[in-house]
Amino acid sequence: MQIVELEMVPLSLRPVLQRLYDMKTTQSALREGVLFSTKRNNYYYDTGTGKVIVLDDDTSYIFRVLFDPTLSAETFLISLTKVDPNAVKNLLQTIDAERLFQRPPLLSMGKEIAAGVTDTEQKVEQIILEVTEQCNFRCKYCVYSEDFSGNRDFGNRRMPTEIAFKAIDWALENSGAKLAITFYGGEPLLNFKLMKAVIERSQAKRGNKEIVYSFTSNMSLMTREIATYLAQVPNLYIMASIDGPRTVHDAYRVYANDAPTFEDSIGGLRILADAYAGSHMPVNINAVLTPPFGFEKLEQVNAYFESLDWLPATCHVNITYPSYGTCPGLDEYYDKITGNPKYALHGMCNPLMIWQQRKAETDGLDAYKARNIYYHSIFDDLVKINNRIIVDEPTLRRGLNGCCVPGKKRLYVTATGEYK
């Protein structure tokens, strides 16, 4: 079959059809966009413009043929004869008017990254200080355990004050109007003295620069003295590591002598909450979902965090799976549940996401009742979709994802003063 045989296509739209035909001939449609579906509709996301169009049944059929690499270009033309002629005409008009399927070809890779390395005006955005390698916990899924080869093991080194000050002074001189300072460990509160010194030095030398501070803590070393000090630090954000109720938390988060940590962690978080009483509490929670991943366990963990009424209702509870290769028994558990349709989503085993989506559908998303393990995951994804780049002129828009220009976005300083 030839394009000229399709009488339902006006002459003015045949160049559009020819472009689709050529695309099908080379099976290059997959780089132009993505087909996806919800319970109510089928959609097409256009890579070049960021636009999303709703597909009726006829256009959905045409697009499925277009995107199927096992079907020929002739089959694509034949598909146009099997639907309402007006649907074909309207589809081609939409593609032409919205400038769909016109993403520019990728002719080079990494030019903007290479250029950034030689730019003498680079301004670092975040400096991460490894204030200590020490940790008083030995969480069974920790990426720094001796059983995981991807990172260093736990050490005993602490960052000296002179290294911290030198790093901070450099960052203050080589950053823009805003600088993020992050304290990292180990457990950062093991070297709270240095954290406090860095905060006070950076505040004294910041000038008009805005500084944002952050750190993640297991909360076990939190005292009223520390909490009172932290509560008066401007632009400070804290992430508390707590996995859920006692039985869930203590199953994997233990001290070096294998003793449980729940009481000390939740007690430290309560002390911090008391210090912020009557004011905004910039503290969120990070939980790790350990085996088993069943819906019953997710309900248990969710109910626990919802019950902590001494925390702000808007407290962000982030929950993730353990890093690959870190959690004992994780591979065996995945082998057991993989293939179970109860936990399958888009061809992948993902019980957490399935539960989160169902919970959002049944209970809704209420910003004033967000202290749970589904609100922020779903809401943040929706925000990303809503704030995506949408343009009329098709463009590549951005460089390679995951590629960092050294010293531009963030800089990690080890306890011994090495840059990473």
What role is predicted for each listed range?
Residues 1-49, 55-71, 78, 327-335, ...:
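Auxiliary Fe-S-binding modules of radical SAM enzymes
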Residues 6, 53-128:
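Long, charge-rich, low-complexity alpha-helical segments
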Residues 28-31, 36-61, 369-420:
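Accessory C-terminal segments flanking Radical SAM cores
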Residues 50, 134, 188, 220-221, ...:
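Short, solvent-exposed loop/turn segments at secondary-structure junctions
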Residues 83-90, 94, 108-228, 233-236:
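Conserved alpha-helical substructure of the radical SAM core
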Residues 131, 143-145, 240-245, 317-323:
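Short loop/turn segments at strand-loop or loop-helix junctions that form parts
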Residues 185, 215-219, 240-242, 285-289, ...:
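A cross-domain feature marking catalytic cores of carbohydrate-active enzymes
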Residues 247, 252-266, 270-402, 412:
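Radical SAM enzyme [4Fe-4S]-AdoMet core and its adjacent flexible, acidic
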